[in-house]
């Protein structure tokens, strides 16, 4: 074992690098020293730190004098910001933030070189800060409005469900009154006009109208099924789109049920693509209005 250790130790000594020796140090050629200067460094033109300079990599100076700043500028008004989209506000926020960073760097540099004349920089920064505060105010207004809409939508759904239950529970002496209430409700909540001639076909027939048609048709159908349980087994629930729902808006529930039964027995296609729903409703309602005029 000792023999092996000696052999390894001898090999290690033999392979060890010998120190370098110069016979004559005067013959060694040294490179001239590099003078430290910014010209010795190449900075990428798209380096992120260029964002802290007013003109990016084209900036000619690292500090702008007061005369170089736009002192005639003003902050954005709240009214102007309210007309901007979320994308515009997002972009404007970061443009303002970038300019504030440039000003902050220049003020810090001025402190380092004992340049105290930075009050103009501070004035411009105050305008930018005011713009940021107003952007936050506009976003807060939109957030508050959104939350109120959400709350109203929830309250609306609760009211619609409550009315549906009262409509289904109404007895024969109350149903006429509830039908009148339903007419007022469908107009107030969904824009469904009491008379066909009151419609603006291009603006009134929309997604809101479709939602109202779904609500009105199913509430009438549910009451009809409650009074005629044998029909429920035959027709089934729910209705298949606006083609089957529209008769409940235009006619008595019993007549509407017969029309739905005839549609299904004929094998006609009643499920429409979404893009065809509004054109179908406009055409069908106009045809119903013309038929009323001939009667």
UniProtKB/Swiss-Prot annotation:
Domain of life: Eukaryota
Primary localisation category: mitochondrion
Gene3D superfamilies reported for this sequence: 6.10.140.1190, 6.10.330.20
InterPro entries named among the record's database cross-references: MRP-L47_sf (IPR038340), Ribosomal_uL29_mit (IPR010729)
Keywords: Mitochondrion, Ribonucleoprotein, Ribosomal protein, Transit peptide
Location(s), subcellular: Mitochondrion
Coiled coil: none
Gene Ontology MF terms in the entry: structural constituent of ribosome
A GO CC term attached to the entry: mitochondrial large ribosomal subunit
A GO biological-process term: mitochondrial translation
Subunit relationships: Component of the mitochondrial large ribosomal subunit. Mature mitochondrial ribosomes consist of a small (37S) and a large (54S) subunit. The 37S subunit contains at least 33 different proteins and 1 molecule of RNA (15S). The 54S subunit contains at least 45 different proteins and 1 molecule of RNA (21S).
PANTHER family the UniProt entry points to: LARGE RIBOSOMAL SUBUNIT PROTEIN UL29M, RIBOSOMAL PROTEIN L47, MITOCHONDRIAL-RELATED
Family membership noted in the UniProt record: Belongs to the universal ribosomal protein uL29 family.
Name the record gives this protein: Large ribosomal subunit protein uL29m
Gene: MRPL4
């Amino acid at each position: 074992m000792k023999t092996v250790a000696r052999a390894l130790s001898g090999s290690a000594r033999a392979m060890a690098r010998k120190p370098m020796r110069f016979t004559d140090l005067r013959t060694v050629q040294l490179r001239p020293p590099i003078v430290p200067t910014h010209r010795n460094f190449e900075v990428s033109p798209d380096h992120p730190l260029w964002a802290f300079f007013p003109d990016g990599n084209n900036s000619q100076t690292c500090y702008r004098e007061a005369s170089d700043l736009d002192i005639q500028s003003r902050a954005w008004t709240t009214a102007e910001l309210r007309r901007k989209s979320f994308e515009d506000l997002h972009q404007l926020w970061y443009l303002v933030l970038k300019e504030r960073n440039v000003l902050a760097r220049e003020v810090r540099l001025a402190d380092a070189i004992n340049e105290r004349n930075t009050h103009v920089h501070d004035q411009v920064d105050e305008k930018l800060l005011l713009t940021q505060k107003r952007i936050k105010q506009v976003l807060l207004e939109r957030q508050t409005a959104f939350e109120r809409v959400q709350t109203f939508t929830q309250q609306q759904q609760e009211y619609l469900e409550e009315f549906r239950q009262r409509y289904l529970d109404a007895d024969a002496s109350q149903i006429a009154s509830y039908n009148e209430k339903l007419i007022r409700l469908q107009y107030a909540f969904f824009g469904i006009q009491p008379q066909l001639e009151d419609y603006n076909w291009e603006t009134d027939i929309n997604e809101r109208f479709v939602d109202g048609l779904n609500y009105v048709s199913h509430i009438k159908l549910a009451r009809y099924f409650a009074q005629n349980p044998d029909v429920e087994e035959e027709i089934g629930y729910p209705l298949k789109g606006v083609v089957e729902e529209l008769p409940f808006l235009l006619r008595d529930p019993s007549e509407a049920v017969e029309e739905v039964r005839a549609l299904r027995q004929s094998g006609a296609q009643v499920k429409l693509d979404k893009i065809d729903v509004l054109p179908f409703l406009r055409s069908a309602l106009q045809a119903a209005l013309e038929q009323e005029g001939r009667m």
